[in-house]
């Protein structure tokens, strides 16, 4: 079975007075095949400028999964639909697939990307916390570690394993207490039980 349809999503300027913003329009092709169930293909490049002035680009023709969070979170907490933060999802997975940026910096811009996309702050902080806890991490392709140890591999990426009960409590805490991002980072760091298989890229 093969299903494709195309949608164009307008990307607005800064939201809520933030300097971070998406540029242009996102044109994506929805895929439903045996190989790529619930995936999208980016037809045109997507650009995002963060609050520090750096521009992040997701190149055209990348095939991207239509989710940012695992079922452990999506099915147990009433978070916004992925379609409400589609551009942020494209941004993050584009960096994962590209494998050239630092995963720490990529995760750090998720919150401001969500805000730039129009997400309410409490939802943005909850999604940000989940990405910090269980989101993809990777060794950059151009790093010395990759060149010395993993040159024969097309990529090296992994997900950390959080204590999901504590993560769900943390999402509830964010909704009630509205903590700062540093407070969220500290709490999330404490609930990760396994950072991953890679000795250098934790």
Residue ranges of predicted features:
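Bacterial N-terminal signal peptides
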Residues: 2-10
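N-terminal signal peptide c-region/cleavage motif recognized by signal peptidases
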Residues: 12-14
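Extended terminal accessory/targeting regions
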Residues: 17-202
């Amino acid at each position: 079975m093969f299903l494709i349809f195309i949608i164009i999503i307008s990307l607005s300027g800064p939201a809520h007075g933030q300097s971070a913003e998406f540029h242009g329009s996102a044109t994506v092709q929805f895929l439903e095949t045996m190989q790529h169930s619930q995936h999208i293909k980016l037809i045109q490049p997507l650009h995002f400028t963060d609050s520090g002035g750096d521009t992040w680009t997701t190149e055209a023709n990348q095939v991207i999964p239509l989710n940012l969070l695992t079922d452990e979170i999506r099915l147990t907490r009433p978070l916004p639909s992925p379609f409400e933060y589609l551009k942020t999802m494209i941004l993050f997975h584009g960096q994962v697939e590209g494998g050239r940026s630092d995963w720490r910096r990529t995760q750090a811009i998720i919150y401001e990307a969500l805000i730039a996309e129009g997400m309410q702050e409490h939802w943005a902080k909850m999604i940000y916390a989940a990405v910090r806890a269980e989101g993809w991490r990777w060794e950059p392709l151009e790093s010395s570690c990759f060149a010395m140890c993993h040159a024969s591999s097309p990529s090296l990426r992994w997900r950390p394993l959080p204590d999901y009960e504590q993560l769900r409590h943390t999402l509830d805490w964010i909704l009630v207490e509205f903590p700062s991002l540093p407070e969220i980072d500290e709490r999330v760091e404490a609930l990760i039980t396994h950072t991953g298989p890679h000795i250098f890229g934790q």
